[in-house]
């Protein structure tokens, strides 16, 4: 259940203040003396009231009271005489005067003095009044509380008869209503209604006053909203209707549902119980339009999260991580030339929450040689340095306990610097931080202490001597003081040559504002105060002022620092800025630099990111350029965007810049410190303050403001209109574009009912502020309000207005409807809706599925498809085409089997359009076949040669064998013929011996023949075998050579094929990139055309902003698309190379296997080889 935030804006008012006490009252400036006044404070602490016998009741709003002091004895003789007349002599006044300081801004201050009967009452009232003022929370009370406050004011401002004049009431409603209407309304309420009538305060209750406001100023706008919620069917809202309204309109949809639960019936009933005046409706759980109106005007519907007004931020980060409320030339009450200096300004500025004030210190010229504060030689009046230090001591920690930085611009001699040091030491005491904290030594790389570390401490920002120089001069000072020499410790070093501070290149000019013209003469300077008075009285012309400006020459701050003052400088040591790179290398966090607005803008223009990084580490101070002699202010937002801590402004000028400053620093308990966003503090984050695209980690927002109506805007019958601006990053800043129509002759309750002013894309809500301002028909500001976007509440809200000095106006409010959403780019609304409400999205899809089932379509027949929000069919086709070349994972590309590789590269989704390469295809290539043919020819030629050699050797061997056989046959035949012839001649019986010899010879011949045959066969076998072996070796050699050539050729062909694949893929990628660029150009043109034709865009500035935003968005989107395409293409190329490498490795493996197989065949052949012959 959503819990109500308990806004405890009241401070406890002591009983003695409520009971009152009698004082004599006087004002010195206008000589007003009023004795025996009964002063009181109401129970809420709204008013300090007083009344004396025979006079009308008077009130002073406590919100306008700046300080309560013990008053000094008046110097005006008339006042003293008046007090003497009532029995209070001058001698009796010591310690009996209460000074009440009040004003609607920081410059126009009024002083009311109250003289008590005794010092005890004075002390009691000073403490009591101090305890109830500076109630910043009370500046944010609801419109209902403001009405009650106004009613109380009317009741206090009674006439001499102690009654409320009807005329006082008519003045409240003077604008837009005739007195007759008011008189009639009073009459209907049973109250006196004549023009000169009086009303008893007891009869004029708050409920009567509220009813009167509703009669005279009816809230028709809320009535219309009420009817819209209930459909104009009833006079009440039910609990369900109220819950629905609260969740749909009054709750920021971006909020966490656990930390900020939705409203439920129980919470709605609590609201009805609290705000519904009709008891019967309350019992029935219903709320009327009156109860609804009361609820909308209550604290529960504040325009900001009220806890942001408390101290809610962490205060333990280094000082450099905070924005610090800072003042420039704090002492001035007006212009920079001839202006008046005032000690009071220091009080007012510090009480307003400022934490850095400036003191321009110069040598006093009087006999007492007292240091003074003035604007150099710019014809401004002087104030005493010691008075300023006293004022700072009294007010530094009244409204905030966090550290105050005194920015010295030191032009004083060493003598007067010593006096300055002693004043700071003696008056501030323990408040002055004279030495660095032990936990945060002054060392490079060491972070600055936090605001919590420096609570109730005053730091001095001034140049510091080099450590060795400071030590040397301090020792000399100490030795001379111990020696008891007559020389004063303040001036013993006065004649020393000026020593360099930290280094010669580190001199810093706090105000290099005017560096032209000749220095003024001593005579001119002698008339400075007279000139200042002339300027104040308007006797000096603009030409005179311009002449003085032209002759003015800025005198830089001294570098001849007194060592005693130097020792008091620690965490705010100014140095001359030498560049961001130098500062980063030095890494000295306690060094800081000052930039006038022009120089600061120059660095922002050229080194924005470096400036942000610099401000993460050390502090920077920005101050107005010298040309702002009218004390106008620059726009601080641009420097907050860069993380500059001390964006110093002229507090005396309540212009737009100061309004932004005061509105921003109202958060975090008005303590003067605001923690910078995370990305502006972390060294690992990069932030460009000129970015036009959302920052990483930061969700952009859409903010729309519908201005519905205004209430009590003016007591005059005038026309009014409302402007709504936003300030933030340059891309978030929209000003002078959104304004309502003019509603004439009605300052009381104008109804604007404008269409919503939409700030469509706020990329950095943390730095953005909303400004709502009301102007009259003469373009004069009536009231304004600054609302930081990071604490803005959504819904129908009443926005109470402030004056130009940020003081709350009593009754004026603007009724608005504020809508806050997460920024959703065009075309993504459906997706975001589905994500934010998946149940609703699912219910729609389920309903459609049910409808399809009713038509006979089964759920299983419905495919799950991705959501497509594209409005461009061609874009969809392009996306489909791009999807065809999306690479798969590496696991899908990796071949898992030899067979898969042997069959070629598998089809890959990303590279499937590239022709596949298979080894079989390589072997069918013409070059390979031609090479095979050539190799076969070589092999055939060798075989033919071998066959010829075979034939030749075979013939030779056969001839040799035939010759041996023939010789054997011949010799055998010869022996047989001799035997035969002998047997014929001698007879068979006589030739036995011869026959026996012949047989022996034949046997011997046969044996010899066999031996010869055996020898020749062995020789032939050897020769034939050697020839066969030689032929086999030659054939094997040429086969090996051919195989190697085949492998090399296949590898070469594969590499060529790979190169062609790569080239084809490159061409495909080039074509793809070209198509994408053309498609992107087309989208950009179509989008620009759509914006130019969009009739809902009503002004040129918004159209240009949309085009600029579109171009920025498209640029980022297109670059991302191109980056993704390049990554995809790179991945495809890598995948292709990987597959090609795997294929090449496979081919080499296959080649090795072929060679191994051939070697095995060779070995088998050798093992099977036997001696052979052809015979």
Swiss-Prot record:
Q: What is the effect of changing residue 360 to N?
A: In ARCND2A; likely pathogenic
User: Disordered: where is this region?
Assistant: 482-511, 863-895, 1082-1110
- Give the consequence of mutating residue 621 to H: In ARCND2A; pathogenic; decreased function in phospholipase C-activating endothelin receptor signaling pathway; dominant negative effect; no effect on localization to cell membrane
Please provide the record's keywords in A-Z order: Acetylation, Calcium, Cell membrane, Disease variant, Hydrolase, Lipid degradation, Lipid metabolism, Membrane, Phosphoprotein, Transducer
- UniProt keyword annotation of Cell membrane present: yes
Q: What class of enzyme is it?
A: hydrolase
Give the UniProt entry's GO cellular component terms. cytosol; plasma membrane
Where in this chain does the record put each PI-PLC X-box domain?
313-463
One Gene Ontology term from the biological process aspect of the record: lipid catabolic process
Q: Which residues carry out catalysis?
A: 328, 375
For the modification N-acetylalanine, the affected residues are: 2
Query: Polar residues compositional bias: what residue ranges?
Result: 881-895, 1085-1094
- Compositional bias per record (Acidic residues), positions renumbered to this chain: 493-508
Pfam families in the record? C2, PH_14, PI-PLC-X, PI-PLC-Y, PLC-beta_C, PLCB1-4-like_EFh
> Where does it reside?
Cell membrane
Which EC number(s) are documented for this chain?
3.1.4.11
Coarse class of the primary localization is: membrane
Please report the stretch or stretches of sequence annotated as the C2 domain: 684-809
Q: Identify a single GO molecular function assigned to this protein.
A: calcium ion binding
**Tissue-wise, where is it found?**
Preferentially expressed in the retina.
What's this protein's function? Activated phosphatidylinositol-specific phospholipase C enzymes catalyze the production of the second messenger molecules diacylglycerol (DAG) and inositol 1,4,5-trisphosphate (IP3) involved in G-protein coupled receptor signaling pathways. PLCB4 is a direct effector of the endothelin receptor signaling pathway that plays an essential role in lower jaw and middle ear structures development.
Give the disease entry from the UniProt record: Auriculocondylar syndrome 2A: An autosomal dominant form of auriculocondylar syndrome, a craniofacial malformation syndrome characterized by variable mandibular anomalies, including mild to severe micrognathia, temporomandibular joint ankylosis, cleft palate, and a characteristic ear malformation that consists of separation of the lobule from the external ear, giving the appearance of a question mark (question-mark ear). Other frequently described features include prominent cheeks, cupped and posteriorly rotated ears, preauricular tags, and microstomia. Auriculocondylar syndrome 2B: An autosomal recessive form of auriculocondylar syndrome, a craniofacial malformation syndrome characterized by variable mandibular anomalies, including mild to severe micrognathia, temporomandibular joint ankylosis, cleft palate, and a characteristic ear malformation that consists of separation of the lobule from the external ear, giving the appearance of a question mark (question-mark ear). Other frequently described features include prominent cheeks, cupped and posteriorly rotated ears, preauricular tags, and microstomia.
Q: What is this protein called?
A: 1-phosphatidylinositol 4,5-bisphosphate phosphodiesterase beta-4
Q: Provide the species name.
A: Homo sapiens (Human)
As recorded in Swiss-Prot or TrEMBL, the protein's gene is named PLCB4
């Amino acid at each position: 259940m959503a819990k109500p935030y308990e806004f405890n804006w009241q401070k406890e008012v002591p009983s003695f203040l409520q009971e009152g006490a009698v004082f004599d009252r006087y004002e010195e400036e206008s000589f007003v003396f009023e004795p025996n006044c009964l002063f009181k404070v109401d129970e809420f602490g709204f008013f300090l009231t007083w009344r004396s016998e025979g006079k009308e009741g008077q009130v002073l709003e406590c919100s306008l009271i700046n300080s309560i002091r013990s008053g000094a004895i008046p110097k005006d003789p008339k006042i003293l005489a008046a007090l003497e007349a009532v029995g209070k002599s001058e001698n009796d006044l010591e310690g009996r005067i209460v000074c009440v300081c009040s004003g609607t801004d920081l410059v126009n201050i009024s002083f009311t003095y109250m003289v008590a009967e005794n010092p005890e009452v004075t002390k009691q009232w000073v403490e009591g009044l101090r305890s109830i003022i500076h109630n910043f929370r009370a500046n944010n009370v609801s419109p209902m509380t403001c009405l009650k406050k106004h009613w109380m004011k009317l009741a206090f401002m009674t006439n001499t008869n102690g009654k409320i004049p009807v005329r006082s009431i008519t003045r409240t409603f003077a604008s837009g209503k005739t007195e007759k209407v008011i008189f009639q309304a009073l009459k209907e309420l049973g109250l006196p209604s004549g023009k000169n009538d009086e009303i008893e305060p007891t009869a004029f209750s708050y409920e009567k006053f509220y009813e009167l406001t509703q009669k005279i100023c009816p809230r028709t706008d809320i009535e219309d909203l009420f009817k819209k919620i209930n459909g104009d069917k009833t006079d009440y809202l039910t609990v369900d209707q109220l819950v629905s309204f609260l969740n749909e309109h009054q709750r920021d949809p971006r909020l966490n549902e656990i930390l900020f639960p939705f409203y439920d019936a129980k919470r709605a009933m609590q609201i009805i119980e609290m705000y519904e005046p009709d008891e019967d409706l309350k019992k029935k759980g219903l709320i009327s339009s009156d109860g609804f109106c009361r609820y909308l005007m209550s604290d529960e519907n504040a325009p900001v999260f009220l806890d942001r007004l408390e101290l809610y931020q962490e205060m333990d980060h280094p000082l450099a991580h905070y924005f610090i409320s800072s003042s420039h030339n704090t002492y001035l009450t007006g212009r920079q030339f001839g202006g008046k200096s005032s000690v009071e300004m220091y009080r007012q500025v510090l009480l307003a929450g400022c934490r850095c004030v400036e003191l321009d210190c110069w040598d006093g010229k009087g006999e007492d040689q007292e240091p003074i504060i003035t604007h150099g030689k710019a014809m401004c009046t002087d104030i005493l340095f010691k008075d300023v230090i006293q004022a700072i001591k009294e007010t530094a920690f009244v409204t905030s306990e966090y550290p105050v930085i005194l920015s010295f611009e030191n032009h004083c001699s060493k003598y007067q610097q010593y006096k300055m040091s002693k004043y700071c030491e003696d008056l501030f005491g323990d408040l002055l931080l004279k030495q660095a904290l032990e936990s945060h030594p002054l060392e490079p790389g060491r972070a600055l202490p936090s605001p919590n570390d420096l609570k109730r401490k005053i730091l001095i920002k001034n140049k510091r001597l080099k450590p060795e120089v400071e030590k040397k001069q301090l020792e000399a000072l100490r030795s001379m003081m111990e020696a008891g020499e007559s020389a004063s410790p303040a001036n013993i070093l006065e004649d020393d040559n000026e020593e360099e501070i930290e280094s010669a290149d580190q001199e810093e000019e706090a105000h290099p504002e005017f560096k032209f013209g000749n220095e003024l003469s001593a005579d001119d300077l002698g008339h400075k105060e007279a000139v200042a008075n002339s300027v104040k009285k308007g006797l000096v012309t603009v030409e005179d002022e311009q002449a003085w400006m032209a002759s003015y020459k800025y005198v830089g701050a001294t570098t001849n620092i007194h060592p005693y003052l130097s020792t008091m400088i620690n965490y705010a040591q100014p140095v001359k800025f030498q560049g961001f790179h130098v500062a980063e290398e030095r890494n000295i966090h306690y060094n800081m630099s000052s930039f006038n607005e022009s120089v600061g803008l120059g660095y922002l223009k050229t080194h924005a990111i470096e400036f942000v990084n610099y401000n993460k580490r050390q502090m920077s101070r920005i101050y107005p350029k010298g040309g702002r002699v009218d004390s106008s202010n620059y726009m601080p937002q641009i420097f907050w965007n860069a993380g500059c801590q001390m964006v110093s402004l002229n507090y005396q000028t309540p212009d737009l810049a100061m309004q932004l400053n005061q509105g921003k620093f109202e958060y975090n308990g008005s303590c003067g410190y605001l923690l910078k966003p995370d990305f502006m503090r972390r060294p690992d984050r990069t932030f460009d303050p000129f970015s036009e695209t959302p920052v990483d980690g930061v969700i952009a927002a859409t903010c729309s403001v519908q201005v519905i109506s205004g209430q009590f805007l003016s007591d005059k019958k005038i026309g009014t209109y409302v402007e709504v601006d936003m300030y933030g990053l340059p891309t978030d800043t929209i000003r002078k574009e959104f304004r309502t129509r003019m509603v004439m002759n009605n300052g009381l309750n104008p109804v604007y009912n404008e269409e919503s002013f939409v700030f469509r894309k706020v990329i950095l809500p943390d730095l953005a502020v909303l400004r709502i301002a009301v102007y009259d028909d003469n373009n004069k500001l009536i009231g304004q309000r600054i609302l930081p976007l990071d604490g803005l509440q959504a819904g129908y809200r009443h926005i109470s207005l402030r004056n130009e000095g940020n003081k709350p106006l009593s009754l004026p409010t603007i009724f608005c409807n504020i809508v806050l959403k997460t920024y959703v780019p065009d075309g993504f609304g459906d997706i975001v809706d589905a994500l934010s409400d998946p149940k609703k999205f699912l219910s729609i899809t389920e309903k459609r599925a049910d409808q399809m089932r009713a038509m006979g379509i089964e759920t299983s027949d419905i495919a799950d498809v991705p959501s497509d929000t594209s409005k461009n069919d061609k874009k969809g086709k392009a996306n489909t085409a791009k999807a065809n070349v999306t690479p798969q994972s590496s696991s899908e590309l990796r071949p898992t089997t030899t067979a898969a590789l042997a069959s070629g590269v598998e089809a890959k989704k990303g590279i499937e359009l590239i022709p596949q390469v298979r080894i079989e295809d390589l072997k069918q290539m013409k070059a390979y076949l031609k090479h095979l043919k050539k190799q076969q020819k070589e092999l055939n030629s060798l075989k033919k040669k071998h066959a010829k050699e075979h034939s030749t050797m075979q013939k030779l061997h056969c001839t040799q064998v035939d010759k041996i056989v023939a010789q054997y046959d011949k010799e055998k035949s010869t022996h047989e013929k001799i035997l035969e012839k002998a047997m014929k001649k001698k007879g068979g019986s006589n030739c036995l011996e011869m026959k026996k010899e012949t047989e022996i010879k034949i046997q011997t011949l046969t044996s010899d023949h066999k031996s010869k045959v055996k020898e020749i066969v062995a020789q032939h076998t050897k020769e034939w075998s050697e020839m066969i072996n030689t032929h086999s070796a030659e054939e094997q050699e040429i086969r090996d050579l051919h195989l190697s050539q085949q492998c090399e050729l296949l590898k070469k062909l594969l590499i060529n094929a790979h190169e062609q694949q790569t080239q084809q893929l490159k061409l495909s990628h080039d074509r793809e990139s070209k198509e994408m660029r053309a498609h992107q150009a087309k989208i950009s043109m179509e989008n620009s055309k759509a914006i130019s034709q969009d009739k809902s865009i009503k002004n040129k500035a918004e159209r240009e902003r949309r085009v600029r935003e579109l171009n920025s968005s498209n640029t980022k989107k297109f670059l991302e698309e191109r980056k993704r395409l390049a990554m995809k293409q790179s991945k495809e190329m890598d995948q292709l190379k990987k597959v090609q490498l795997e294929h090449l490795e496979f081919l080499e493996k296959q080649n090795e296997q072929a060679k191994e197989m051939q070697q095995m065949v060779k070995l088998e052949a050798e093992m099977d080889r036997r001696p052979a012959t052809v015979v």
